[in-house]
């Protein structure tokens, strides 16, 4: 019998094929005969959730714990030393008491408490000791089995007023749960992969939260210790919308309607959806907010690692150097085609676990070939025609929707305008990360009773961890706009990104994935080579990382890394202060730290500009004073627009050639306001 089998009685109740269970003393004896360690690990959740304020008292000739009585009343304490050598004379299973002398008894739970207080090893726990552990575990509702029980049996397990939702996903199967339990018990770094739609993001964190609820706080489950450190787990996500949507899903599936008093907390953009949190719950947080509170968590889950979100990569790099400060690191992605070898090399004790199983429903693939090569000027127009024609014979039913993946916001606007002309019987809705009421827009798309089909014309924003219940079709152009300092490139996506896009369907019904590109063009994207490197440097200094070798992804241009570090040092602001600024503000331009460092109204107004695009006259003046100059070398007029070619005159990217456009005529120089906007030089 494996250790996994010993933990099968603690599996999280998915209410599909795993249900809450209260075991009898007779069943305990049967399990004990199979393996003396069965139910011994119950000691840990009982210490944490039942015995934390327990003491022995004596009532009506029975030694018992105060928690077995009316807890609102005080009782005289009995010192443990007075009872340390007692042994049962006889056992009354029905009353759950041992007789220890002619007229004196002790409850099973009190006896377990008394004996376990003196143990150092899980192997010391006997059958007599486990009887009280079983009683306490039944009260806590921490056991489960495959014996079907009514949904209401899950009420109250986590103080939830309503039942757990019935979940069929493979991520909550017993096999998956036991494997994850084993890896967590061994304190491995765990990399979880599996098809999109099997519940990695929506369900697996509940298994990890449940493990932490039961056993979190102990590094070694073979040792019995009554002292522990209780900390929550965190599910770290790249975008606010993912935090919100997954948070609501967790809340409702765990039987809650309100965050207050639940085990679920949301943290994003300076907001916290919670006031009173359960200590062993789950925090859903944006990567940025996770990054500066790593020590607050027992287990850290980083999702969508294939995206190589800058802060996510930094979190992994920091934790690799400080792995002993947490219990476990869990990384999740639909696929690791581009990253497995590096993670194997980078993490000290990593284990890869793939959750087998297809998505819930089949996905049909259709290739619509573009007759022009991608480098042809005619490619884009042909692509638009192909999409428009395809929507005539391959479209969602009324009330359902499709997702059209495009590279950028400007492309979304252009394609929507084109497609509406020839598809007037469909609704086209643009989706991207800057839409302020994105959750409401997506909810409206999914509301019952919609009379027309709709197409969500989306940037890669919808690529990950958002389930659109009415989505039946994906139309993929296979491209993504990758920003780079003072510009950007449109690239073909990686295989990982393609897998994510395809996985937007097949979750709630059969799906169709239509792709308008040659899959031979897919290749990995090394995000760090397209990014400013300042944030990597600030975090590296804070957490004593050695650059570049301690980074998960090492930049190709190491000279730029050195130049960027020297540039930051020239600000004469301590790295501790820089870190504080970076974790509290967006800092889209590194030079903004000079304004944020002043604090007060100046910092407040700049933050308002970065978050809400509200620019005051004072903030405009402050940004101009940073002298972020661009020299205009050439000017070309196209219709009503002026197109400029210029070069950067500041920082490590000095002399970088950039292209700007505006309806206004500028001469000689302009000030950069943001990486993407500029104003008159005066």
From Swiss-Prot:
It is found in: Virion. SUPFAM superfamilies: P-loop containing nucleoside triphosphate hydrolases. InterPro entries: DEAD/DEAH_box_helicase_dom (IPR011545), Helicase_ATP-bd (IPR014001), Helicase_C-like (IPR001650), NPH-II (IPR021892), P-loop_NTPase (IPR027417). It is an enzyme of class 3 (hydrolase). PROSITE patterns: HELICASE_ATP_BIND_1 (PS51192), HELICASE_CTER (PS51194). ATP binds at residues 194-201. One of its GO terms (cellular component) is virion component. It comes from the Viruses. One of its GO terms (molecular function) is ATP hydrolysis activity. Keywords: ATP-binding, Helicase, Hydrolase, Nucleotide-binding, Transcription, Virion. Its EC number is 3.6.4.13. Its main location: virion. The keyword Nucleotide-binding applies. Residues 181-354 form the Helicase ATP-binding domain. Disulfide bonds: none annotated. A motif (DEXH box) lies at residues 303-306. It catalyses: ATP + H2O = ADP + phosphate + H(+). Residues 386-551 form the Helicase C-terminal domain. SMART domains: DEXDc (SM00487), HELICc (SM00490). Belongs to the DEAD box helicase family. DEAH subfamily. NTP-dependent helicase that catalyzes unidirectional unwinding of 3'tailed duplex RNAs and plays an important role during transcription of early mRNAs, presumably by preventing R-loop formation behind the elongating RNA polymerase. Might also play a role in the export of newly synthesized mRNA chains out of the core into the cytoplasm. Required for replication and propagation of viral particles. Monomer. This is RNA helicase NPH-II. It comes from Fowlpox virus (strain NVSL) (FPV).
